[in-house]
Amino acid sequence: MPLDNKVQLNENGKEVNNNNNNDEDLKIQDNHNNKEPFFNRSELVRLLIQSLNSLGYDKSAEFLEKDSGISLQSKEINQFSECVVSGDWNKVEELLPFLKLNEFDTNNVKFLVYSQKFLEYLENHKIKEALECLRLEITPYTKDTSRLQVLTSLIMTSNSSETKKQIKQRSSRVNLLDDIRKYVNPNIMLPENRLEQLIKQSIQYQMGKCLYHNTSEQFINLFKDHTCDKSQMPLDVLFTLKDKHRDEIWFITFSHDGQRLASSSKDNTIIIWDMSTIYLDQPTEPKVMFILLGHTKEVSHLSWSPNDKYLLSASNDSTVKLWNTNDGTLLKTFTKHSDAVTCCGWHPDNKRFVSGGNDKNIYLWSIENLDLTNSNNNNNNHNNNNSNINGNSINGSNNNGNNNNNISPIKSWACARVNDLSIHKDGKQLIIICQEKKLRIYDLENEKTPEVVLMETDAITSMELSNDCNFALVNTSNQEIHLWDLEKQIIVQKYRGHKQGRFVIRSCFGGVDQAFVLSGSEDSTIYIWHRSSGILLETLSRHSGTVNTVCWSPCNPFIFCSASDDQTIKVWSRSNNHNSFINNLTNK
């Protein structure tokens, strides 16, 4: 059919073709292989008209309508949209039949329209009219009493500043039109910015299939398919931090702002490193800020508070210690556990934390009412057999601090030996892994809520939550890493290739949008997988002992660190050493 022929739409928005040729659906032919595409030509033209309008090319859109003979929408639908935006509610109701809705959806749309009318009455302080609208127009079209209660409460508190703010936020005619579109056949009323949505979906699909996608570019070239090469991946060692820890390094973790790194070792010590210099255009080797002494046995786990003011350390000496990260002083020692403490983690309120251990107990602690002034009078004297290494300040103590033994947890849970734990970013759930091959999820706000149990087939040694806390990486003893969807409660991906059987090996998410999974291994190698596909991308062999733990910088997708039994920490970056990066990535 030639483009200048008039095309009519039926009542369902479908094209009516009055010609008798074989091109019934006006489909575009592929010039290369003469195959028909999967879309209708008139739909594409309508999307182009809509896009031209949204870009401000109204005259071009009008010309395309005339030249093609295809209308974006029927005149009644256009009039309906105009009336919604202008607030002509009587005309809106009159034009409702042209939306071709069933009775249920018609009632829902009427409820939306009358609710908008009600909110505008309140916004203009027309309380009497709002009450009449609620009683005569809104109530007949919903059986959901909770929705009515919300609107009624707005009347009762209409003079409060908070209610006025809510009314203003709710009473948007543009938002109303978007809500109405959800009920209408898209052939009749096109979804807003539909062509742009399709382009975004295409780009997101290409990015998802791009194995090495690790870029923060805001704009993607529409003239070619998106691909990334290895140049954006941190595959080269930038620095090797050595001669500070004197035994195996078991744990490392970045502060939330990425400017510091904490490491713990079998040598009973904790080191806080200044990492700010690795992000410079000309990076320099990180320096030791503090060496924290005080534990009498191996330190197996560390956790920064959400505001990075405090650091928790969990040790095989059965204690948890709380440190001031600004000066390295020991603030408190928590001694409730009767066996090695294997893990600890903060609540997002910065006031509470949890600890778990081999004594089969989990404790919830609060520091809110504790005296967190320097609890150790010897901290600032640098005695207790501490020495100053390379001029770096060393703080810490073998004392437990004043009255530490009187600190009691505010809550406890009994379970099997605890291997790892974490608190959801909303503070409502505690996720733990035990030696009984289970992930357990506890409700921290409601004790009556039954725990959720996710079963594994092998022992679970460690766990890492994604930034959105919807997914958990768990390392298992059968040399697999499993990605759990915590909402759907299923394993969505498995990662294989690394070696793990004798030791605790830790993995992490990393890169832009956490698109990669990174893990240490007992074969002295680091493994990198594509998160969504599970494809093994890289193996990095620069350590000379078991790689126990890895962590990716939270503020730069081109930096990660690894720690090993070889007593070193390696800082990894891109080969071109372009480490400067806008440190404003939002921590999810």
UniProtKB/Swiss-Prot annotation:
PANTHER family: WD REPEAT PROTEIN 26-RELATED (PTHR22838), WD REPEAT-CONTAINING PROTEIN 26 (PTHR22838:SF0). The lineage of its organism: Eukaryota, Amoebozoa, Evosea, Eumycetozoa, Dictyostelia. GO terms for cellular component: GID complex. Residues 73-129 form the CTLH domain. WD repeats lie at residues 244-283, 294-333, 336-375, 413-452, 455-494, 499-539, 542-582. Residues 40-72 form the LisH domain. Residues 1-32, 376-403 are annotated as: Disordered. GO terms for biological process: proteasome-mediated ubiquitin-dependent protein catabolic process. InterPro entries: CTLH_C, G-protein_beta_WD-40_rep, LisH, TPR1-like_2nd, WD40/YVTN_repeat-like_dom_sf, WD40_repeat_CS, WD40_repeat_dom_sf, WD40_rpt. This is WD repeat-containing protein DDB_G0349043. The keyword Nucleotidyltransferase does not apply. It comes from the Eukaryota. Gene3D superfamilies: YVTN repeat-like/Quinoprotein amine dehydrogenase. It comes from Dictyostelium discoideum. Pfam families: LisH_WDR26, TPR1-like_2nd, WD40. Keywords: Repeat, WD repeat.
